[in-house]
């Protein structure tokens, strides 16, 4: 399954790859083969990158799900104006090889939504949390508040987030993506217990990253 968030990119890539392949028809056999294979590789990568596999949460109930595929690179306590004091930050680094569709970590309503322009530092640099382009999202339910950010990286310079203020959202559902490598930082409130450690792998909408 392909994500609809990648349709325009796939269309442009298809046109570009087709042009390369057609051009190759006018070259000698060896060059022709190289160009056609290159076109196929480019198109194949585009389809593979924008894959969007179905996901089923590993647990339901009082859990917070991973908003992104990737690797946990930071778990630390910090205060935050949306989630309160002694909250916990969990940062997930998404490499270009990961599925890049993001999913809602907790059911509730969107109570905070703000886009921040910024730089494009490497996503594994923790300064990128505050200095890079990002979309901040806050969800509130009857039981808790969580806050998370889609952060652009050095390669990823396109955040997709169609969410709206006060929109009701459901845990595990798709809500956007970050194209070509990035990170997602999620802040969970005091009283929630992290279920992941640094170095652990996550799958969006499936891996439980915290319990409350």
From Swiss-Prot:
What the record notes about the co-factor is: Binds 1 pyruvoyl group covalently per subunit.
Quaternary arrangement and interactors, per the entry?
Heterodimer of a large membrane-associated beta subunit and a small pyruvoyl-containing alpha subunit.
The terms under GO molecular function for this entry are: phosphatidylserine decarboxylase activity
Instruction: Name the pathway it acts in.
Output: Phospholipid metabolism; phosphatidylethanolamine biosynthesis; phosphatidylethanolamine from CDP-diacylglycerol: step 2/2
Family as reported in the entry's similarity comment: Belongs to the phosphatidylserine decarboxylase family. PSD-A subfamily.
**One Pfam short name:** PS_Dcarbxylase
Membrane topology, from the record: Peripheral membrane protein
Q: What is this protein called?
A: Phosphatidylserine decarboxylase proenzyme
Q: Post-translational modification, briefly?
A: Is synthesized initially as an inactive proenzyme. Formation of the active enzyme involves a self-maturation process in which the active site pyruvoyl group is generated from an internal serine residue via an autocatalytic post-translational modification. Two non-identical subunits are generated from the proenzyme in this reaction, and the pyruvate is formed at the N-terminus of the alpha chain, which is derived from the carboxyl end of the proenzyme.
Catalysed conversion reaction: a 1,2-diacyl-sn-glycero-3-phospho-L-serine + H(+) = a 1,2-diacyl-sn-glycero-3-phosphoethanolamine + CO2
- The UniProt record lists the EC number as 4.1.1.65
Write out the annotated subcellular location: Cell membrane
Site positions for Cleavage (non-hydrolytic), renumbered to this chain? 181-182
Pyruvic acid (Ser) occurs at which residues?
182
């Amino acid at each position: 399954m392909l994500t609809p968030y990648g349709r325009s990119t796939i269309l442009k890539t298809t046109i570009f790859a087709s042009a390369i392949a057609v051009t190759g028809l006018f070259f000698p056999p060896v060059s022709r083969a190289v160009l056609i294979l290159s076109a196929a590789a480019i198109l194949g990568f585009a389809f593979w990158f924008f894959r969007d596999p179905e996901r089923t949460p590993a647990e339901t109930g009082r859990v917070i799900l991973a908003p992104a595929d990737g690797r946990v690179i930071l778990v630390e306590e910090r205060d935050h104006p949306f989630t309160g004091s002694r909250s916990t930050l969990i940062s997930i680094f998404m490499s270009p090889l990961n599925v890049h569709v993001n999913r809602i970590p907790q059911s509730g309503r969107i109570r905070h939504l703000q886009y921040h322009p910024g730089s494009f530092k490497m996503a594994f640099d923790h300064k990128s949390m505050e200095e890079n382009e990002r979309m901040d999202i806050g969800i509130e339910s009857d039981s808790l508040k969580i806050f998370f950010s889609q952060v652009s990286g050095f390669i990823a310079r396109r955040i997709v987030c169609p969410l709206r203020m006060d929109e009701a959202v459901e845990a595990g559902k798709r809500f956007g993506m970050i194209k070509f490598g990035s990170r997602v930082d999620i802040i969970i409130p005091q009283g929630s217990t992290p279920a992941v450690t640094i170095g652990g792998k996550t799958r969006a909408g499936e891996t439980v990253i915290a319990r409350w």
